[in-house]
Regions:
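Active-site-proximal beta-strand/loop segments in catalytic clefts of secreted hydrolases
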Residues: 11, 60-65, 72-75, 122-127, ...
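Loop/turn elements at helix/coil->beta-strand transitions in domains of secreted/extracellular proteins
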Residues: 6, 53-58, 115-119, 151-157, ...
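Substrate-gating cap/lid alpha-helix
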Residues: 60, 161-194
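The substrate-binding groove and active-site-proximal loops of carbohydrate-active enzymes
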Residues: 29-40, 91-99, 123-136, 162-168
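Alpha-helical scaffolding within the catalytic cores
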Residues: 99-112, 136-145, 170-180
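Carboxylate/His-rich catalytic cores and anion/metal-binding grooves
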Residues: 6, 45-46, 52-82, 87-88
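Single conserved hydrophobic/aromatic residue that forms the stacking wall/gate
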Residues: 1-5, 9-10
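Surface beta-strand/loop "capping" patches
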Residues: 206, 210, 217, 221-251
Length: 251
């Protein structure tokens, strides 16, 4: 397993109001020192892929905890959609992470478009619960924009946000619904982790290995062709009411 960005994402988190071409990062061999600040889910994902396909795996770590999806999305996606624009205008400003549209994309994603990546792992959404109504359009627009920037229809696998006591009526569930609808976008896959959260007062669930296992199963099944691996669970189809019974049907 080879890594890019273990130090970059801690030391050199940067923003820009215009797309950049260069980034201060390099490939390193995976070892305890260099993976200290690397994504745990990303590492465990890469480890399982490496063990399954018996080939080197390169992982690029480009993330910033707490950020809304708007800052990872090119401005044209936001400016062309009134619903997305409304959500972006309602974002609060914070000292610890950017909420300006496209700022993280310009500095931390645009320079990576020169890499011939295989796919993307995405775990985000908690900072968009207040504007859940815009998330489906925002997220699917972002995916399409990234693929356009790479000129490649790569797989995009993401994690549905975990249950958390947000203190605001149903916003977490509504964001999860938006993420579920987003899975209709071609060549995407969503991992559900609602059963992996023993404490809904902790917004950072601790079972990272299990989340990575589900992501790697999805990649192995959908991309690497290992169809014997079951990567998707049942999906809700419809409901009906019969007397005192509420009947759910899944596919």
């Amino acid at each position: 397993v080879r890594l890019v960005g273990s130090e970059m994402c801690i030391r050199d988190r940067s923003t820009s109001n215009t797309p950049q071409e260069n980034i201060d990062a390099k490939w390193v061999v995976c070892n305890p020192k260099d993976m200290l600040h690397f994504s745990a889910i990303g590492y465990f994902f890469g480890e399982k892929i490496n063990q399954s396909i018996h080939a080197p795996v390169g992982l690029i770590n480009s993330n910033w905890g707490g950020t809304p999806a708007e800052t990872w999305t090119p401005n044209e996606v936001i400016d062309e959609n009134p619903v997305i624009k409304k959500g972006a205008d309602e974002l609060g400003q914070f000292d610890w992470w950017p909420s300006n549209t496209a700022y993280a994309y310009n500095a931390m994603i645009a320079p990576l478009t020169k890499f011939n990546i295989t796919g993307v792992l995405w775990y985000q959404g908690e900072s968009n619960t207040d504007t859940y109504y815009a998330y489906e359009s925002l997220f699917t627009g972002m995916i399409k924009a990234w693929r356009k920037a790479w000129n490649k229809d790569f797989p995009f696998y993401y994690v549905q946000i975990a249950p958390y006591a947000y203190g605001r009526y149903n916003v977490g569930a509504l964001l999860r619904e938006a993420q579920t609808k987003s899975a209709q976008t071609t060549n995407t896959g969503m991992v559900v982790i609602s059963d992996l959260v023993p404490d809904t007062t902790n917004i950072h669930p601790t079972l990272k290995l299990e989340v990575a296992d589900r992501l790697s199963n999805m990649a192995l099944s959908k991309y690497y062709g290992k169809k014997e691996i079951i990567a998707d669970g049942p999906k809700f189809d419809q409901y009906s009411i019969e007397k005192d019974n509420f009947i759910l049907q899944f596919t």
